[in-house]
């Protein structure tokens, strides 16, 4: 083909000022707009993206995008980024061109699974890490697999991503094979979850401790900045200590639920879900120590200001 013509076509694509990544909608529109050209030829889409797409439209339109592509035998090849481990977002450094201020912009970048399988908190607040999952985003991998395409993971390290190269890991393919994410449909996985009590429990624990939920955010996100006024500081510290008590009860209850379900863990056939159990249990225990020390530090500082 004419490479220059292809480049011109790419350069002619207008910039979308909305900032939204309507990936599934774009796939559907592309197939529909070009399906009349498919006669005795193999249709293929090459999807190049550094995000995982809008979560709302991904949830609603992924299967429609797959079925639309299948209807004309269109294969989907994706050049994309590695998903964040068990988390929908990452944060990218952006320097304001006028002020020079650095801002951390939230970007959709995962997870590698149909539903999050890890805690969304780091113990103090919602996660802001960039731990590598070893796999591509669920939607992009599923589209590729279901249409007999391929997901190609871009290999370069993103220096502007939060933590830079500190959280970048390279995994051996064979070592990761037992931990491959389930790429079946969300509907199928939801039904299977209802039949497997341990997976249901893990989902409940993740949901109960999710700082993205507005109804639990006041408890699962602790205060990280305080007034420099001594009286106001003490009042804020006392309020946070009360929240810590509630949070510790949350965590203790979750730990007890996980311990009571250990027998289910021994019967679980998926190595990935066994690992999910182990990691979440360890985090719950560790977070209790973290919150206890946080409360103790507030107490020590309060005594200084009284």
Please describe what each predicted stretch is.
Residues 39-44, 70-77, 147-150:
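Loop/turn elements at helix/coil->beta-strand transitions in domains of secreted/extracellular proteins
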Residues 305-306:
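Conserved small/polar residues in nucleotide/adenosyl-binding loops
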Residues 272, 277-279:
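Residue signature of alpha-solenoid helical repeat architecture, marking inter-repeat boundaries
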Residues 4-43, 53-56, 80-89:
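Von Willebrand factor
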Residues 1, 47-51, 79-82, 154-157:
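Active-site-proximal beta-strand/loop segments in catalytic clefts of secreted hydrolases
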Residues 51-142:
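VWA/integrin I-like adhesion module and closely mimicked acidic/polar interface patches used
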Residues 101-245, 249-250, 256-270:
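C-terminal "exit" segments of structured domains
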């Amino acid at each position: 083909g004419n490479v220059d013509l292809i480049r011109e076509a790419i350069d002619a694509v207008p910039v979308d000022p909305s900032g939204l990544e309507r990936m599934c909608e774009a796939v559907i529109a592309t197939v529909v707009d070009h399906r009349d050209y498919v006669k005795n030829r193999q249709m293929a889409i090459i999807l190049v993206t550094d995000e995982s797409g809008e979560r709302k439209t991904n949830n609603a339109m992924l299967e429609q995008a797959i079925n639309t592509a299948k209807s004309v035998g269109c294969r989907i090849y994706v050049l994309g980024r590695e998903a964040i481990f068990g988390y929908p977002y990452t944060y990218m450094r952006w320097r304001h061109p006028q002020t020079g201020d650095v801002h951390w912009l939230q970007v959709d970048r995962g997870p590698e699974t149909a539903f999050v399988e890890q805690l969304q908190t780091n113990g103090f607040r919602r996660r802001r890490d960039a731990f590598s999952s070893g796999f591509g985003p669920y939607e992009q991998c599923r589209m590729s697999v279901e249409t007999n395409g391929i997901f190609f993971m871009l290999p370069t390290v993103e220096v502007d991503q939060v933590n830079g190269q500190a959280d970048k890991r390279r995994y051996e393919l064979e070592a990761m094979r037992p931990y491959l994410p389930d790429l079946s449909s969300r509907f199928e996985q939801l039904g299977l979850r209802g039949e497997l009590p341990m997976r249901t429990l893990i989902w409940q624990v993740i949901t109960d401790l999710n700082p993205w939920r507005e109804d639990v955010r006041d408890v699962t996100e602790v205060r990280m900045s305080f007034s420099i006024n001594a009286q106001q500081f003490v009042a804020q510290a006392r309020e946070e200590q009360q929240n810590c008590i509630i949070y510790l009860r949350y965590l203790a209850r979750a730990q007890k639920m996980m311990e009571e379900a250990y027998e289910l863990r021994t019967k679980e056939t998926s190595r990935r879900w066994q690992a999910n159990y182990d990691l979440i249990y360890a985090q719950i225990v560790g977070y209790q120590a973290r919150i206890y020390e946080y409360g103790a530090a507030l107490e020590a500082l309060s005594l200084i200001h009284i």
